[in-house]
């Protein structure tokens, strides 16, 4: 009987596939909303401190906040620094 069920089973409809994809997108956005309200201000302050020593483009600074569990938060900071000759003021 299982063989008969295999051949008679229907493929997923496009509506079901779209629903699953939408659920994934919503779940990803919910995770992104967990960043604290102070994060944009912190990014601005970090950029100001870095600019005191090295001239960098604000677009070259990437700050990501990730919640890992209830009591662990990770703040990841990536900066693309200019070449050594350009860093001197």
Curated annotation (Swiss-Prot):
The keyword Cell division applies. It comes from the Bacteria. InterPro entries: MinE (IPR005527), MinE_sf (IPR036707). GO terms for biological process: cell division; regulation of division septum assembly. Pfam families: MinE. Gene3D superfamilies: Cell division topological specificity factor MinE (3.30.1070.10). Keywords: Cell cycle, Cell division. Prevents the cell division inhibition by proteins MinC and MinD at internal division sites while permitting inhibition at polar sites. This ensures cell division at the proper site by restricting the formation of a division septum at the midpoint of the long axis of the cell. Belongs to the MinE family. NCBIfam families: minE (TIGR01215), PRK00296.1 (NF001422). This is Cell division topological specificity factor. The lineage of its organism: Bacteria, Pseudomonadati, Pseudomonadota, Gammaproteobacteria, Enterobacterales.
């Amino acid at each position: 009987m299982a063989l008969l069920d295999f051949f008679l089973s229907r493929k997923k409809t496009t509506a079901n596939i779209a629903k699953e994809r939408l659920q994934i997108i919503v779940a990803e956005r919910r995770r992104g909303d967990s960043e604290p309200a102070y994060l944009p201000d912190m990014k601005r302050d970090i950029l100001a401190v870095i600019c005191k020593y090295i001239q960098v483009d604000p677009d070259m600074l990437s700050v990501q906040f990730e919640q890992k569990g209830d009591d662990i938060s990770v703040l990841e900071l990536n900066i693309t620094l200019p070449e050594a000759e350009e860093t001197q003021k």
